[in-house]
């Protein structure tokens, strides 16, 4: 990858029924943890307990560069706040 290039992500907030989205352009060498934190803060949800997944529901490891995420998963991603991450439903028999 060339240094100095940028990648763009369209991030949709899944917890809002209106499915608002924002488009971010970041340096391709930026850590994806920073992208996750920035996106969460833009949507006013806690970044420490949020996750980003693909439109197909595949979780993304944030310990890689934004450029790697773009190449592996494309530009359309979904932000899941804590109330949606790892939810467990228990039904009484």
From Swiss-Prot:
A family per Pfam: Ufm1
Keyword Oxidoreductase: no
CDD domains: Ubl_UFM1
Listed InterPro entries: Ubiquitin-like_domsf, UFM1
Positions of the propeptide segment: 87-93
Keywords, comma-separated and alphabetical: Isopeptide bond, Ubl conjugation pathway
GO cellular component term of the entry, any: cytosol
Superkingdom: Eukaryota
Cross-link (Glycyl lysine isopeptide (Gly-Lys) (interchain with K-? in acceptor proteins)): 86
Record carries keyword Transcription: no
A biological-process GO annotation: protein ufmylation
Family recorded in the similarity comment: Belongs to the UFM1 family.
Job description of the protein: Ubiquitin-like modifier protein which binds to a number of as yet unidentified target proteins.
Protein name, per record: Ubiquitin-fold modifier 1
